[in-house]
Amino acid sequence: MANNSTGNAGNLMWYEKIIEGLTGPQIINDSKTPSGRVHIGSLRGVLIHDAIYRALLDRGTEVTYRYGIDDYDSLDGLPADGAPSLQEYMGYPLCNIPAPTGSKATDLADHYISEFLGIFKELEVGAQVYRMRDIYRSGRFNEAIDIILKKSDAVRKIYADVSHADRPGDWHPFQVICKNCGKIGATQVTAYDGKEVTYQCREDLVSWARGCGCNGKVSPFDGNGKLPWKLEWAAKWHTFGITIEGAGKDHCTKGGSRDVAAHCLRKIFGDAPPLNVPYEFFLVSGAKMSSSKGIGTAAREIANFLPPEILRFLMIRTPPRRTVNFSTDFDYIVKLFNEYDRLVENVPPDRAFDLQRKMLRTIEVNPASSACHPVGFQLLIALLQLPHIEVEYEIGKRTAGGLTQQDQENLKKRLSAATYWLDHHASEADRIELQASLPASATELSDSQRAFLHLLGERFPDGQLGEEEYQKFIFDITRLTPINQKNAFAAIYRVLLDKEHGPKGGALFAYLDRAFLVRRFSEINFSREAFWNESGITREECKDWFRKNKGQIACTNAKYLVNALIPAKESPDLHRYIRGKGVIEINVILSDKKVHRLRVMLSDFEGEEIDLKSEADYLEVYGNNFLKEIETIANIEIEITGKPIIYKDDQ
């Protein structure tokens, strides 16, 4: 998941780019048809518009954000969770259909939209909500309806020219609520005399609703029907004075619904269309969603999972024209939280217009919520699975000065999110268990990994340290082994959790018993010969390293090591060896005070009767000459510590 928080190059966020040339008061609009449980993708438009709204407020612009509930639309498909009894209401306005049994809602539309609007409050969305039933019934659209019906011929021409959709010569852009059966989706208007429309409730107009066959005349005003949604869109823009309204990319294609609505607005009302903000799809694991078909994850479920500021971050950080492909898998979710945490922790307090601060202002639901140090989500997932740990208490105990009230609130939200993820989304592969004994899979570790773990056990600090201190300790040991960090942490997770991944190593150490960790790491054995072969470097590689770091070296010392391999079941006193190696370990402290260890391969020997002391003496003479070369290259002095150390290992 790429970090797109800056949106565009320069000092402007994507939403600032959108409003850069706007002047005067602004009215933003968005809407939703509550035809089923609202999916998470519908929140993208809500929050894109809300980001623009907040940016305009910050700029001091007079701005209103309106959000419409298109509840006068007809039921044109059975909702995924709908009872079979809803079939009899196919074609009815959504707001005229009874709510499901047991629902506290007033009707079906209210049943579905109430859950969605509850999320608005949690996310601090600044929209003023209106319902189309109220707009039609109050007569607010009467003027627009009259104008549109009187220009039905112009509408038919726009449909034909823009979207290549032919309508019959008597077709009028209006849908009446049948006085006989109450359906709106099966009626067709064929005439308008300036006061009433003539309509027929047809049995065969659509495949999903069967009209009653009634013919009649009725006033089109005061809620007796509605405009087709492309004309309704234009009527909203005209009536409400909308200046900004984006839409999903499927509506913004040439000849698409947005194009038709914009042409109708210009031709019928003489108005310029609002500023468009086209936005790409919000996908879940690569799939597009649909509320009416029940495809995708419900917005309420994700809002139950993600803390509000994380959900806003998810929707707003990516510029509208880029797809968001959301997933609840482990890697995606941990990365999402980590990227938010980096944003919060790296905001400079003295740079009010910094890009990071602008993003934080746009995603926060409460300034205090982003003013504290967040606890890593991956760590919380791990701690919740460790036995005998009261997570909130243990975190508080390890926090300097204790947890503030805001810290506690944030931690509770994150613990709730981590628990929800474990209960609803974690796969078996994602779950961890602290291993009571060394797992069998530890045999798969390389000798460098095993030597690293053994050194961890040897040098494990006394007393209780903090997460960052333990993390520094781990990094120090990786440089002293030496081993690359990825392989080092993989080894830690393997012997503690029997996994290839895990939470931040230093954090894990901070919450586990020291004696347990020392015991586990110290029981790891390794082949010194194999370890040296894996971690050793050539003389030329060593020279190159010193050339590269010349001028940064603060202190250097070296020692000689000899390792001889004894045949299996042979006594070391017989002095019979298969083979051996001589190395020089150079410890270098750089100007950043970090210690690095270079293990330089200097000699190899083999034979039945080997005099190890002679080999050590040879190594020392040969090594001293090599160290003089290094001293000349780096313009330093190297201290040699003691005589060569001789190891005798079993085969």
What residues fall within each predicted segment?
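Active-site cores that bind ATP or allylic diphosphates and position pyrophosphate for catalysis
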Residues: 125-129, 133-279, 283-299
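Charged, often glycine-rich, active-site loop that binds/positions anionic groups
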Residues: 73-89, 144-145, 288, 294, ...
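Catalytic adenosine-cofactor/nucleotide-binding cores of aminoacyl-tRNA synthetases and other
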Residues: 253, 258, 268, 280-423, ...
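Glycine- and acidic
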Residues: 29-38, 130, 239-250, 283, ...
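Basic, alpha-helical terminal appendages of large translation-related enzymes
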Residues: 1-23, 38, 65, 156, ...
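A structural motif corresponding to the C-terminal end of an alpha-helix
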Residues: 59-61, 115-128
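A glycine-rich helix N-cap at a beta->alpha junction
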Residues: 88-105, 116-119, 123
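N-terminal catalytic cores of NTP/NDP-binding nucleotidyl/phosphoryl-transfer enzymes
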Residues: 2-83, 234-253
